[in-house]
A protein has these predicted regions:
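Amphipathic alpha-helical dimerization/coiled-coil segments
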Residues: 1-16, 36-37, 85-111
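Regular, well-ordered alpha-helical segments
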Residues: 22, 66, 97-100
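Short, hydrophobic-biased segments on the C-terminal half of alpha helices
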Residues: 61-62
Length: 111
């Protein structure tokens, strides 16, 4: 029976990998930063805020939405985008757990 190599890892690691993959492009980080700074759901074209085409921005929005980091709600012909607070908290916990583990085991004592 065939299986994917990712099947060898537990679900917590696989979930973390999905989040990290979504963060692995500067455009997606810029989109998250923009949504966080505006603190409201954005109606309209986020591509006006980035040096990328509308099509490229939409592809990155899709990646972020598939990872659950943002929500997109259709309102007529526009989509309202905002951060997903539950997933953002989950992301923070994943980062904190990984940071604590690395810092503790390597004795870096980062401050």
């Amino acid at each position: 029976m065939a299986y994917a190599k990712t099947d060898l890892f537990d679900s917590k690691l696989k979930s973390a990998a999905v989040l990290f993959k979504a963060l692995a492009h500067p455009a997606r980080l810029a989109i998250l930063k923009y949504l966080a700074e505006t603190k409201v759901c954005i109606t309209g074209d986020i591509s006006d805020e980035l040096p990328l085409s509308r099509t490229t921005v939409n592809q990155h929005l899709t990646e972020l939405k598939n990872a659950g980091l943002i929500q997109g709600h259709v309102d007529g012909i526009k989509v309202n985008y905002c951060l997903d607070p539950v997933k953002v908290c989950e992301l923070g916990k994943v980062f904190q757990e990984l940071y604590d583990l690395i810092n503790r085991s390597a004795n870096y004592n980062c401050k």
